[in-house]
Every structure is written in C-alpha cells, then in structure tokens.
UniProtKB/Swiss-Prot annotation:
Reactions catalysed, as given in the entry: tRNA(Lys) + L-lysine + ATP = L-lysyl-tRNA(Lys) + AMP + diphosphate
Principal location class: cytoplasm
Residues the record lists as binding Mg(2+) 1: E433, E440
Binding site for Mg(2+) 2: E440
Cross-referenced Gene3D superfamilies: Bira Bifunctional Protein, Domain 2, Nucleic acid-binding proteins
Cofactor binding annotation: Binds 3 Mg(2+) ions per subunit.
Entry-linked SUPFAM superfamilies: Class II aaRS and biotin synthetases (SSF55681), Nucleic acid-binding proteins (SSF50249)
Protein name per UniProt: Lysine--tRNA ligase
GO molecular function: ATP binding; lysine-tRNA ligase activity; magnesium ion binding; tRNA binding
EC primary class: ligase
Length: 524
C-alpha cells in the first residue's frame, strides 16, 4: 500500500534526513562495544534547579564556586560551541570549545538536533548572563532517527499535535505546562478531600448494568462469563453502595466513558471526580465546591482570578475574560435563570413566569414556550413531561450565558432520577449544577434515599428508553436492594476534571487537556 504523503517534497526531504541519521547510528554502533544506546550515565541534576540556585549569581561568583553538574536531556539547538539541552524541567546550555575539548567536539559529528545526551562539567555564566556547563564529559545516550519539526515554525498543525503528542510535548512548552498544571489540579483535589477525612476508593470500570448518569454507554463482552458488559458512564451507584456499607465520606478520581459525540467540550473517555458525604445536603456541597476551587486556584495559580482568552485564527488575543473565584458564587434557580437570561432570546415574549413556576398545571404553555425559543424535539419527546421541557428551555436560552461562577439549583425531578425531592416543592429536587464561562463543570445533589421513590424513577427511565431515548437509565435492582438496607442522608457531586483543567489553563478545547484524545483514523 502506497502512502501518498511520502511522495510530497517535505516527506521526501524527511526520509533523506532519516536515512542520514541511520548511517550515523550504524557508525556509532561500529565504533563501540555496546548497541549505541548506552545506559550508564548518572544524571544528578535538573536544569530548573540549577537555574533557580545559580541564576542570580554573577559570572565571577560562579568561577569562584567551581561547582560541577551532571545533566541529561534532548539537544534542541547547536550554536557553535554551545548545545541547548532540554530536560523535563527546562533548558540549560552545554559548552565545548573545539581547540580545548577536542575529544568531545569530535563526537559532535554524529550529533543531531533531537538526540539525547548526558554532559558533566563546571557551571559558568556567559557574558550575556546565560548559565552553561563547561563540558569535561559528554555521552550520546539516544540517537534520534526522526528530525524534529522546523524550529522556527514549531508544531502548529493541530491534528499532528493530538495524534503525536510526544512531538508536541518536546516542542511546545505551553503544552508541557498544561499537563503539569493538570497534575497539580488533580493532586490539589485529592489533598483537599483527604484532609477532610474522605477516603479514596476504586470501583469497577466494567459493569453489568450502566448507571449513575443519563448517557449512552459503550458495550463489550466478557468471554469467560459469556456476558455482555458496559464501560461505566459514572461511578455513582457503586460509591453510594459504599456509603450504605458505612463509609461516610468517599471519593474516586477516574475515567468514565460515554458513547456520544466529540466536541470542544466532550470526549468519549473523560476523567471525573465524584465524592459523597453522609449527613450532608446539597447546600453543604455547594459550600465545599466554592472552598475547593478557591483553594486549588490559589495553590496552583497563585490567584483566585482566572484569565481566559478568545483568539482569532492567527492566535492573536481578541478578547479577555476574568473569572473571580474569590467572590461568593452566584446561586440561581433554573426558572430564575430562564427569566433573567432568556429575556433577549428569540421567543422571549412567550416566557410566562406564572406557568414556569406552576408547570404541572400549565403543561401546554410550557410546551409552547419550548417551541417558541427553539427547543428541538425528537422521538423520545412524546414521554417528556413539563420538567424535561423546562430543562430544555434553560439549556437553550440561559446555559451558555452563565459566565461568572454560578450554581443553578431547583432541577425538576424528571431530569434528576437520582436526586432527592425538595421538601417544600416535590416538582423540584435538591440539586445543583455549577457553571463557569458557559460550561457545566459540576453536578451535585442531596441523594435520593427512598427506595420506593427510586424504583418508580427507574421505571420511568425504562419507559423513556423504550420510547427511543438511548441515554435513559436502566433499572438497577441491586441498587434498590442496597437502598432498602438504608442509605443515610447523603449528598454527592461529580466534577469534570478535563473541563476544570480547560478553565485553569485557558484551553479552548478539551483535546488540549487530554494527553491522547480520541481521533478518527487517518485516511490512507
């Protein structure tokens, strides 16, 4: 099979460079007893640590200190007697003068940009103020057979960045910083919860019955059991089983899977944190969420004000937005959000506050409002009740306008099959979703612990599935059985890690914060 891409001038030039590098590797192998990839260099220091310790010292101070450092990393540039070496922490220069360090410079004939080397020597500072290691030892540790992208252009092709993330990480410091930030955010969440006596647990990825969210699952087959199974869409039901069992505070940070579309905010495989607390309600969780995000922002970013930007096709910033996590978050009911944000939407004249606040007695008016504002119906709409229509109206007219940190509360029970009904108004539940910049980041509620009510809601979900809604939940008899043993008053929440990282790192698409996002196979 012929790869048409290999016939382009760029591909032909690359193939020539690869061939030249293979020749160099063969020469290296022929001149040494090993295989050309030695593993005997002891790296003792990182570039960033050296820069932090000695960056402010003068040239004269370093010459007096005469400190020796051993570093290793990838060669990113060759400039006369200097090599620019990049390790996991940053960059530093190595120096070898051809008339003094002849033996070392002789080895540079086989050196290419992208090779991995180890160097050792005394630290100095150049006249321009740059630190460098004056080499008395040099080892080629790994020969890079493929050339890195052109240094002046870097790696700008988005497809290549996502498909070959390893190249992106080598070339782009911003990408490396994004994933370092992601690691710190996850660690911050874990530390925040464990310091408050939450226990981290692991629950199954493979499930016989998918549950815990309304979403279409991925299917697989267990050969030994001859059993169809599902990749989990959420860990919720198993985590609440643990609360039934006596673990009052639990959390899990792990992957979930939903067989749905891909967008700038959705990836079929994604990471979330779910946590559950006995003897708490959804108000407690809103308070916890505020404190958690504020704490993590301060620890990771050094500020509670988050800057996000909108860029044009040239990468130039055309708009800045600032989200203040230091102020109390807005709390707004779903109906109030519709009335506040929907007033400028098409069909706004149809929005009837009285009907929205008494939907069960104004179902026809609710449906008329939904049609007026542009809600699209589908094959499952025939089983929608007023609560589902109100939620669709909210998503159409208000959700994308929730810019500053906002909790939306009072979700109808119809769209909240696992949430506890409100004591004063049984049409709504004690549930919230959290939004920043028009993105949903979290979903939490006081848990439904009435086994009979839960069974009825599962049955309604089954009816919706039978009507064509492939995202509706299955009936989970074992979960009902667990509730019948008694779930204490409990509140639980899920936060999308990927979207949270997008917010904290000013990333416009979810693919920028997932190391290896799902992509369509490349055309042959």
């Amino acid at each position: 099979m012929t790869d048409k891409a290999n016939n382009t001038p760029v591909a032909q030039d690359e193939n020539k460079l690869i061939a030249e590098r293979r020749v160099k590797l063969e020469k290296i192998r022929s001149n040494c007893s090993a295989n050309g990839f030695p593993n005997d260099f002891n790296r003792e220091h990182l570039a960033a640590d050296i820069q932090a310790e000695h960056g402010e010292k003068t040239k004269e101070e370093l010459e007096e200190l005469q400190v020796t450092y051993a570093i290793a990393g990838r060669v990113m540039a060759k400039r006369g007697p200097f090599l620019v070496i990049q390790d996991s922490s940053g960059r530093i220069q190595g120096y070898a003068e051809k008339t003094v360090q002849k033996e070392i410079r002789a080895k540079w004939g086989s050196l290419d940009i992208g090779d991995i080397v180890g160097i050792k020597g005394i630290l100095h500072k150049s006249g321009k103020g740059d630190l460098y290691v004056n080499m008395d030892h040099y080892s080629l540790l790994t020969k890079s057979l493929r050339p890195l992208p052109e240094k002046f252009h870097g790696l700008s092709d988005q497809e290549t960045k996502y498909r070959q993330r390893y190249i992106d990480l080598i070339i782009n410091e911003d990408t490396r910083n994004t994933f370092k930030m992601r690691s710190k955010i996850v660690a911050g969440i874990r530390n925040f919860l464990t310091q408050r006596d939450f226990m981290e647990v692991e629950t199954p990825m493979l499930q016989i019955i998918p549950g815990g969210a309304t979403a279409k699952p991925f299917m697989t087959h267990h050969n030994t059991f001859d059993l169809d199974m599902y990749l989990r869409i959420a860990p919720e039901l198993n985590l609440k089983r643990l609360v039934v069992g006596g673990f009052d505070r639990v959390f899990e940070i792990n992957r979930s899977f939903r067989n749905e579309g891909i967008s700038t905010r959705h990836n079929p495989e994604f990471t979330m944190i779910e946590f559950y607390q006995a003897y708490a309600d959804y108000h407690d969780l809103m308070n916890t969420t505020e404190e958690m995000l504020r704490t993590i922002a301060q620890d990771v970013l050094g500020t509670t004000t988050i800057r996000n930007t909108v860029k044009n096709s040239e990468g130039e910033v055309v708009e800045e937005k600032f989200y203040d996590l230091g102020k109390p978050f807005v709390r707004l009911s779903m109906v109030d959000a519709i009335l506040q944000y929907g007033k400028d939407h098409r069909g706004a004249e149809q929005l009837d506050e009285a009907a929205l606040r008494d939907p069960e007695n104004n179902f026809d008016a609710i449906k008329a409002m939904a049609k007026a504002v542009g809600v699209k119906e589908n094959s499952a709409s025939k089983v929608w009740g007023p609560g589902k229509y109100i939620c669709e109206i909210f998503e159409e007219v208000a959700e994308h306008l929730l810019d500053q940190p906002t909790f939306i509360t009072e979700y109808p029970w119809e769209v909240s099959p696992l949430a506890r009904r409100n004591d004063e108004n049984s049409f709504i539940t004690d549930r919230f979703e959290f939004f920043v910049g028009g993105r949903e980041l979290a979903n939490g509620f006081s848990e439904l612990n009435d086994a009979e009510d839960q069974a009825e809601r599962f049955q309604k979900q089954v009816a919706e599935k039978d009507a064509g809604d492939d995202e509706a939940m299955h009936y989970d008899a074992d979960y009902i059985n667990a509730l019948e043993y008694g779930l204490p008053p409990t509140a639980g929440e899920g936060i999308g890690i990927d979207r949270l990282v997008m917010l904290f790192t000013d990333s416009p698409t979810i693919k920028d914060v997932i190391l290896f996002p799902h992509m369509r196979p490349e055309a042959e």
